[in-house]
Design a protein with these regions (language model features):
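Metal-dependent catalytic cores of enzymes that make or break cyclic nucleotides
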Residues: 1-157
């Protein structure tokens, strides 16, 4: 995986360090494919830095080919990254994070999923999802009904 030296670096990353960061989705795919309990989820997890507009990484998968789960993970990943305190900065307030992420609504993030995440964040439920509570999951399903297996986009591998 990515070295903690890079992940915890308090200064701007070099081009080489950023290139290492951009490899982690491929490592996610490889690692999860070797764990039978997670194999079915590996391509979804690996797509979490892809964007609807096809400008994500590492595979530049266009939105129509991204799985529903990957779209949810993309929103959750950025939200968590911005709200969490890191060695190099304090976590940002939820309102500021929503404002930052809103700039990518419909280009990086699925609009419906982003709107559902905003609703969860505004009522405080999104924070509790880090504990994956049944209540939070049920609220997410009410806001964005989860697609059935037949409706899911094709996975990448």
């Amino acid at each position: 995986g990515v070295s903690n030296r890079i992940l915890d670096k308090p200064a701007k990353l070099t081009d080489e360090e950023f290139a290492e960061i951009r490899k982690h989705p491929a490592w996610t795919l490889e690692i999860l494919n070797h764990v039978s309990a997670f194999r079915h989820f590996s391509s979804d997890a690996a797509q979490h830095h892809e964007r609807l507009d096809g400008r994500g990484y590492p595979w530049k998968i266009p939105g129509e080919k991204l799985s529903f789960t990957a779209r949810v993970l993309a929103v959750a990943d950025v939200y968590e990254a911005l709200t969490a305190t890191r060695p190099y900065r304090a976590g940002l307030p939820v309102a500021k994070v929503i404002g930052i992420m809103a700039n990518d609504r419909g280009t990086a993030f699925d609009s419906e999923i982003f709107d559902a995440a905003v609703a969860l964040a505004e009522n405080g439920t999104f924070e509790s999802l880090s504990m994956v509570t049944e209540d939070g999951f049920e609220q997410l399903q009410q806001i964005v009904p989860l697609a059935s297996a037949e409706e899911m986009p094709a996975r990448v591998a």
